[in-house]
Amino acid sequence: VRPYLVAF
């Protein structure tokens, strides 16, 4: 869950 990368 990384909304600052791609949305993972």
UniProtKB/Swiss-Prot annotation:
List keywords of the entry alphabetically. Answer: Antimicrobial, Fungicide
Superkingdom of source: Eukaryota
Query: Which biological process, per GO, is one annotated for this protein?
Result: killing of cells of another organism
What is known about what this protein does? Antifungal activity. Inhibits mycelial growth of F.oxysporum, M.oxysporum and P.piricola. Inhibits cell-free translation with an IC(50) of 28 uM. Antiproliferative activity against MBL2 and L1210 tumor cell lines in vitro.
Q: What is this protein called?
A: Pleurostatin
The organism of origin for this protein = Pleurotus ostreatus (Oyster mushroom)
